[in-house]
Amino acid sequence: MEDFVRQCFNPMIVELAEKAMKEYGEDPKIETNKFAAICTHLEVCFMYSDFHFIDERSESIIVESGDPNALLKHRFEIIEGRDRTMAWTVVNSICNTTGVEKPKFLPDLYDYKENRFIEIGVTRREVHTYYLEKANKIKSEETHIHIFSFTGEEMATKADYTLDEESRARIKTRLFTIRQEMASRGLWDSFVNPREAKRQLKKNLKSLEPCADLQTKVSHRTSPALKTLEPMWMDSNRTAALRASFLKCQKK
């Protein structure tokens, strides 16, 4: 699974996922299913944001190419992928500026058009089951929830899907592609079956036993990739980075 993740996802996403896991003392080489899940979730968050801007009249528009110097503000603030301290700093700044209620848990995005935080979910199970779990955890009507599955299903708060149909179709297609690529490598069953995943985890732990003395200290240096997540007006570098974040899986 680890090899698949490094082949399938953009290096920027892989780096962010590794950093997030190490922040919680988790090892991507051992908890490979979680590694894959985090990368998938990060990519969906990037794709959710990509191409969506607000113009000088505060109207929401979709721009796939054009003048990089145009005064276009990104519609979505990406919170997922930042270290916790920076993420809460961004959330507090948004709340102070907009007056929206501060969430109890870190959300994934902020929508400047609808003035609400968004929690993105990607599930291997039934969408309604995962949606209810998210809603029960968050317990806030202020945070919008949007759930995607690997089978093309989705569910959102009050059936408000935020994005246009084409943008959501891109996300669904990417998730289906990831599922197909996993299946072709014999990885899908362990990804969705907890019992099989536990067996694989034990196997991974056993294979890494001789390396138990390896350094595990977490680095607190800011990843260069995080610079692409800073609030900013539209520029060609960020657009290119976001475009790269949903490259198709590379074949072996």
From Swiss-Prot:
Subcellular location: Host cytoplasm; Host nucleus
Chain positions of site Important for efficient shutoff activity: K202, K203, K206
Location of the active site: E80, D108
Chain positions of site Important for efficient shutoff activity and nuclear localization: R195, K198, R199
Swiss-Prot/TrEMBL keywords: Decay of host mRNAs by virus, Eukaryotic host gene expression shutoff by virus, Host cytoplasm, Host gene expression shutoff by virus, Host mRNA suppression by virus, Host nucleus, Host-virus interaction
Sequence intervals crossing the membrane: none
Record comment regarding domains: The probable endonuclease active site in the N-terminus and the basic amino acid cluster in the C-terminus are important for the shutoff activity. The C-terminus acts as a nuclear localization signal. The C-terminus is recruited to host protein complexes involved in nuclear Pol II RNA processing.
Family under the similarity heading: Belongs to the influenza viruses PA-X family.
Role according to the record: Plays a major role in the shutoff of the host protein expression by cleaving mRNAs probably via an endonuclease activity. This host shutoff allows the virus to escape from the host antiviral response. Hijacks host RNA splicing machinery to selectively target host RNAs containing introns for destruction. This may explain the preferential degradation of RNAs that have undergone co- or post-transcriptional processing.
Quaternary structure annotation from Swiss-Prot or TrEMBL: Interacts with host RACK1.
Protein name: Protein PA-X
Protein source organism: Influenza A virus (strain A/Vietnam/1203/2004 H5N1)
Lineage: Viruses, Riboviria, Orthornavirae, Negarnaviricota, Polyploviricotina
